[in-house]
Each structure stands twice: as structure tokens, then as C-alpha cells.
Amino acid sequence: MRVTSLLWSSLVIPAAVGFQVRFKPSEDTALDTVDDGTLQSLLDNIGLNGSNAWDTRPGLVIASPSKKDPNYFFTWTRDSALVLKCITDAFAAGNTALQETIHEYISSQARIQLLNTRSGGLSSGGLGEPKYRVDETPYNEDWGRPQADGPALRATALIAYARWLLENDYYDVAKSIVWPVVKNDLSYVSEHWNTTAFDLWEEVNSPSFFTTIVQHRALVEGINIARALDETCPHCESQAPQALCYLQSYWTGTAVRSNYGQGRSGLDVASILGSIHTFDPEGECDDTTFQPCSARALANHKAVTDSFRSIYKINGGIKQGEAVAVGRYPEDVYFNGNPWYLATYAAAEQLYDAMYQWNKIGKITVTDVSMPFFKDIYPEVQTGTHESSSPEFGNIIAAVKAYAEGYIEVAKKYTPCTGMLSEQFSRDNGTPLSVADLTWSYASYLTVMARRNSVVPASWGEKNARDIPSTCVPSSATGPYQTATITHWPPNLTPTAQPSPCPTALPTKNNVRFRLLATTQVGEDVFLVGSIPELGSWDVKKAVPLNADIYADNCHQWYVDIELPTAVAFEYKFIRKRGGEVVWEQDPNRKYTVPQTCGVSGAIKRDTWR
């Protein structure tokens, strides 16, 4: 994703992620009961409290802790917004520990909006600046700028929180603190949606399907949230239909052409990302908005994933209709053009989204456009509408589910034993490549696992925004910009009602497995010591020893299971002992809060010795 760009695979339950189950899973859907640590790995990359981001400004999301070969130690508007949308959905569903992170993010974005950059100032195009330094100063070197998807995605993330505030009777906070930041982004989108910008991979300066589709969603949500706040957004109202109209131009008849130029086919996982990030659980299989279950989106899924079948060595021998490793686009040459974890998870997520929609509307319609997709995974399929009461409905769902699970298994197969996600994995042997601990990757894993368990975000209003206007014209509209100054957040913004009540009392104890990747010598042992009594209160003589019984040549992993009180925050470090010598790992201290989530009986914290 950056002239470059911006996964692992373990299991996380909906409660641990914190989303709300809005559609009851089938009886054979097994929900996981252990927080696998992915959410914590994501939070570790957010300043100021994240263990990988302790030297960043509060609320800033770093793309990766990597500072060289390549350097991703910056904050990107797009990536940050996608990560915060994931966090905000989790918070809205009951994970209240995430609220401070959301507040710090919104405050940081209010400050960043005011920076003068090479893209401009607040009202002169500056919101299209793609990335910033972690001290909230501009990045003034050459880059692919402007990028117009960031403001749209940020507006969507902030609107999700504003919606929660309204639902919990905090109207004044939504209107006075969140709305001014959102309003600036909406003004940028309405003014610039019809202008050329760099795509999400920061390589092609052309119209982009991903950018247009997320801009359309943001404008629609802008209309709705403005009304809820007794505000108006006439520039949203005039431009949303036109953006939808333009969105249709990316459809070729068989697939989405994601962008133009540089001799590409236009097949790009960005189109699948566009569908999943505009998925509406209340929507139907609408072609105009490329909903995940639409004929267009399914045909495109086949076209995009098929484009990687023959070009990656690790996909060799995999039959048509079976899941494969997925990259960005087949002509990719960055790091030699490899599969990406987030791309492979996106291919799975669209299928889970589609199954949710089919179950919700109670039917599956197979058309000439979508037939090739269905035929690959269920050769007996016939065109027509298959009602949920029919055997064919169940057969198709089973086939799609198996296909989706296949993509999860592909990503798992090439994930290291630590579960820590890099950006890419080798097209030849599956070895993780490029930067480690990619924040967007962790977010993509959390969302695909949520969808896998029929856990979905709130509707964005697609049902009332899918009709193409009778007259389509290239246009733009200027909206107001204003300085959004956030000096403080009111205390005690607690939920007035839990959206998904816990059927039992919240746990007071949680068994936490600390997993450490550390290369050691014979006779050397590793210990855990920290600020709470259970970890020795920083006394090395009371440090907790780690086990090495799963340490192997290809996985230098130590671990220990410790029962800890829930909701307790503490600091800790790992130490090595050999004879009478004690070696501490480098500063700073690590930080962790023991999860206290409905239904979660265990958690995993993943670390690497430093």
C-alpha cells in the first residue's frame, strides 16, 4: 500500500473483538472462547500507550513499527481510518476499554487537519495528504499525493462513533466535538471526489474504484448524520448520487476495472476491499453499490482471485474453485509481487459478507453474470432464484462457506508460529516478507473473523442510496471548512445500554498466555517480571519462568500461562538468566491490560525479545 503499501491467523471470538452479533449464527458455528491477542497486537501500534508506538503522539496509528527496509513508521490517513473503524465497531458493541483510544484518535485527526502540507491547507486540498510523521508534523518528501480515499474513510470511522454517542444520549458531544472534524472531511470529499488522485496502493494517479466507492458511502453517511445532528450537508446530498453514477463506469461487464494506466489489466484486490468496506448488513445484493453478494461483486471476486492462480508458485496444483493466495494485482512488482495477508483475508471476508446477506434476505439469485463464480465451487448450480427453504440454498451456502474457509486456511498456512503478521508472504515458498506487525493486517484479520461468526457493523443506509439518478454529470460541490479544536473530552461517556448483554457475570480472572519469540542458548532461561504482585513486582527473584517445551529450530518460542485479575493494567518486561547473570530486554516497559470480556476465558499476548 505505500509505493509499497500496507496478517497471521489465529482465532478471536466476537466478544473478544467486541462487535455485536446482529444475525444469529447457525447451530454448527463454533464461537471461539479465547482472545488470541490480535486486538492487542493492533493496539500495540497506536500511540501513546502502544508498546510499539510509545514515541508517537497520542491517537496516531503507525502503519508498522518497522523503521527501515522499508520504513513504515509513519501514520497514513487511510490505514488509520480503517483501523479505527474496526476499533469503533468493537467499542460500540460493548468493548468499552477502547473509548480512550477512539478519543485520542479523533483529537489527533483534528490537529492533523490543520497542518499545511505539500497537498495544501485545511480548505485548499490539504486533507488529501496521505501520510504524516509520528510527531504530527508534515511529511515533506516526494510521495504519491494527493490521495482522496483517506478523508472519506476517516469520516466513516468518526460517524460510527458519533452514531454511538447519539444512541447513548450524548448529542452535544457528537455535535460539538465529532461533527466539526467530520464536516471538514465531507467538504473535501464533495469537492474532490471527481478529481484525479493516487489509488490506495499509492502508485497510479487515476480514477480509482476503491476511492469512489468509499467516497459514495461517506457522502451518504454524511447526509444521515447531519440530519441526526440537526445540521445540513447539501453538498453531500448533491454529490452522493453523482458519485454513485460514476461508480458504474468501473464495471466492464465481467469484472471491475479498479484503475487506469501503467499497462495493467485493472484486476485488483482493491475492488474486493471496496466491496467489503461498503458492505451493509441491511442491504441486498445490489449491483449498483457492488454489495458483496451482488452478481457483479461475485463475478469480480472470481476474476481477481483467478488472476493469481497461475503466477504464484505456492498456488501450483490448486484446483479451480479452491482458495488460493491473493496479492494486490497480477502485474505487481513491489518486493517481486507477492501475496498479501490482507488481500487473502479480504477474499474470504467478501464471501462471509455474502453469506450473511443471503441468509438475511432468504434467497440466492444466480444470474448469467454470477454463474461462473458459482459454477467453480458448485458445478450443479442452475441460474434462477433459490429460496432459503430449498435444498439448493443450503448446498450453495455450504459450498461458499467451504470456499471462504479455504482462504482462511491459506493465510494460516503461511503465518509464522508467533501469529505476528507481516505485509506479504513469498510467492515461491510462503515465507513472510516486507514489514512485520502491519496494523492494517491485524484489523483485516479481526474483521474477517467477525464476519466468519456472522458479526457485523451497523448499516450505513445503502438501501436508500442505491438508485442511479436519471441525469449523471461530472460535478463537485464546495462545503464549509472550519478549525475543529478539541481541548478535552467530557468524562464518564458511559453506555446507557449494552447492545449485546452478557448472559453471565463478567469474569474476574483471565488465564493469559504470554508468548515470546526469543533465540536463546543452552543453559539460558527466560522470565517475566512486572509491576503487579503476580509478576513479582519488579523483583527479579520473584520473576515468573517461561517454558521452552515448544521451542524448535523453526520457531524459537517461549511461553507461560498466568491467571491474572481482569481489567488490571500493568507494565512488564522479559529477562534472561544464565547462572547468576540477569539480562533485561531494552526499554521501554511493555504495557498490557487484562481483557474482561463476556465469554472470554483466556487471552494471548504475543511479543518478540528486544
Swiss-Prot record:
Enzyme Commission number(s) of this protein: 3.2.1.3
Induction section of the entry: Expression is up-regulated in presence of human keratinocytes.
Domain of life: Eukaryota
Domain (CBM20): residue spans on this chain: 504-610
GO biological process, one term: polysaccharide catabolic process
Binding residue positions for substrate: 143
Group of enzyme by EC: hydrolase
Propeptide residues per the UniProt entry: 19-24
UniProt keyword Ribonucleoprotein, yes or no: no
Subcellular location: Secreted
Cysteine pairs bridged by disulfides in the record: 233-236, 245-472, 285-293
Catalytic machinery residues: 199, 202
Gene3D superfamilies: 1.50.10.10, Immunoglobulins (2.60.40.10)
Reactions the enzyme catalyzes: Hydrolysis of terminal (1->4)-linked alpha-D-glucose residues successively from non-reducing ends of the chains with release of beta-D-glucose
Glycosylation sites (chain numbering): 49, 194
Annotated signal peptide: 1-18
Gene Ontology MF: a single term: glucan 1,4-alpha-glucosidase activity
Keywords: Allergen, Carbohydrate metabolism, Cleavage on pair of basic residues, Disulfide bond, Glycoprotein, Glycosidase, Hydrolase, Polysaccharide degradation, Secreted, Signal
A single Gene Ontology CC term: fungal-type vacuole
PANTHER family reported in the protein's UniProt record: GLUCOAMYLASE, TREHALASE
Family from the record: Belongs to the glycosyl hydrolase 15 family.
Protein's UniProt name: Glucoamylase ARB_02327-1
